[in-house]
Amino acid sequence: MFWVPAEARWQHIQDRAKLPSIGQDVDAAMDLIEKENPSLRGVLPRNYAREGLDKTRLAKLVDLIGSIGFTETDDHCADDVLGRVYEYFLGQFAGKETGKDAGAFYTPRSVVKTLVEMLEPYEGRVLDPCCGSGGMFVQSAEFVKAHGGNRSAISVYGQEFTDTTWKLAKMNLALRGIEANLGERSADSFTDDLHPDLRADYVIANPPFNVSDWHNPKLADDPRWTYGTPPQGNANFAWVQHFIYHLSPRGTAGFVLANGSLSSKTGGEGEIRERLVQADLVDCIVSMPPNLFFNTPIPVSLWFVSKDRHGNGHRKRVGEVLFIDARKLGTMVTRRLRELSDEDIARIAGTYHAWRNHDGGYVDVPGFARATTLEEIKKHDFVLTPGRYVGTEEVEADDEPVADKIVRLTEELYAEFERGRELEGVVRERLGGLI
C-alpha cells in the first residue's frame, strides 16, 4: 500500500496553488512521496520549479484538478478516475508521436483487453517481461475486480528496457494502487533478466516487433533456447522462448507478434515454430484486424501457448490448435486507427473459451474459427496463419437463376446511367446560371 504524507496530499498543494513557490511545493511533495514509498524512489518527476514553467498555468491546472469530484463509489473511486486519466494521456501521447519507436510504450486498450479476457487471470503470478507503461497489469487487475475477485489474488512481475517507460509503468501502477515487482531498475530481459527464477501462471506481453539488434554473444548457448537458437536478426522467437521459459508447469502465455512469425522460415524460425507445435505448446492463434496500433501498420496476431493442455481444469486439448480469423472485426475510429468493441472482444474470447472449456459447446464457424489437428498443421509445413485453416465464410443461399440475375442487374445498371445523365443536365444548367 502506498502512503502519501500530509504535506504531499492534494489539499495541501491546492491551498498553496496561488503562491509563487507552487513549483517548489510540488517538487517537495514528490520528494516526500518517494521517501515514504521506496518502490517509487527515483521515479517521480521533480521539475516543476524550473524557470521555463509558467507558474500561473501550473496554479490553474492544480485548481482544475482540484475541482474534480472524487467520490468513493463502487464504480468510480479516486484511483480508478486518476488511472483512467493517466491512461488517456498515455494514449494521446502515443498517437501523436512520430518515428519508428512512436507509441512503443503503449498497447491499445482493446488489444490488452482481448489478451486478458482470453487468459482469465483470476489469481496467481502474472509476468510481462516487456511491460511498457504497465497496461497488461492494469487490465488484469480490472478483470479480477470485474469478476468479483480481490486484486491481491494476483502478484505482478514486470521488466522494461527503457528507463523513461519503466518510470511511466511505476507511476501508472501506483495511481491504480497496484503493487508490483518491476525490478529495481530498467533492464534488458534477454541479457539481464531481473526475475530469473520466476515461474509465472500467466505471461501477458506485447514485445517490440521484429527487433534486429537484440542479440548479444553471451546468449549463444542460453538455456532459454530449448526449441532452437533464435536468428540474430529478429527477436520474435527469442521472446516466445523467454515467455515459455518463465511459465509454471501449468502456466499459459498470451502475447502479440507480427504476422511474419506465423510463416517465416528465415534463420531457423520455421524449425523453432515446428518444434513448438510438435511439443504441443501452441493452444490458439488469432489473426487480428489491421490498424490497431498507433506506431505501426504491421498486421499482428495473438499467440496463446500453454503447458496446461492435458485437462487440468479445462478440456483435454492435446494434439489440437484453435485458429481464429478476426481480421474483419473492429471499427475505424480515426482515419488510421481501428478499435475492437466489447462485443468483438467477447466474440473472440467466447470462441476460445467454448473450445477450451468442458461442455463449452464449441462448433467451427467457417471463415472465423476452426479447431485443427497437428497432423493437418504438419501438412501445411507448420505455417500457423489462421486463414489457411478456417476456410471461407458461409454465404446465404441465393435461389435466383444466374440468367435472371444478369438481366436484372443489367437493367438496374442502365437505370443508374440514365439517372446520372439527368443529374449531369441539372448541374450544367445551374452552373450556366452562375456564369
Identify the meaning behind each predicted range.
Residues 1-119, 181-194, 287-290, 308, ...:
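Non-catalytic, mostly N-terminal accessory regions of nucleic-acid modification and defense proteins
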Residues 161, 192-201, 208-375:
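Signature of N6-adenine DNA methyltransferases within the class I
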